[in-house]
Amino acid sequence: MISVIVIEDDHDGAEVLAECLRIKGIDVLEKGYNGLDAVQLYKKLKPDFVLLDMLMPFYDGFYGLRKILEFDPKAKVIVVSASIAEDEKEKLTNLGASAIVSKPYEMDALIGVLQTINREKENNLKTRPIII
């Protein structure tokens, strides 16, 4: 079973996403609400994936992405955020994001991204980031 942590500053949004993922058979280990939570939860739980919002107060998603990948360069971080400009997408992929999923999105599309990257990970394949 694929395990994730959900990092989203909107508490209701985090809960809805977590519940939808659980319904689809994804193991949601924990929820966090800023980039610092992302780093602390990743170090503690070592999930298969981090689903990371970008626009959050205090410590944003860029902070979380950088710090998680400094700790574990093989970490799989999927950015799930609204209003990501093209230059930000390039910055995120250069920083090491495994995928960028723009809100709003279909849940099946997000699950497909998780499954694709998980297969690549299991088969030790290195691929380019997925952007949808």
Model-flagged regions — what are they?
Residues 56:
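Receiver (REC) domain active-site loop signature in two-component systems and cognate sites
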Residues 15, 63, 84-101:
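Alpha4 helix (beta4-alpha4-beta5 surface) of REC/receiver domains from two-component response regulators
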Residues 45-51:
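Active-site beta3 strand of CheY-like receiver
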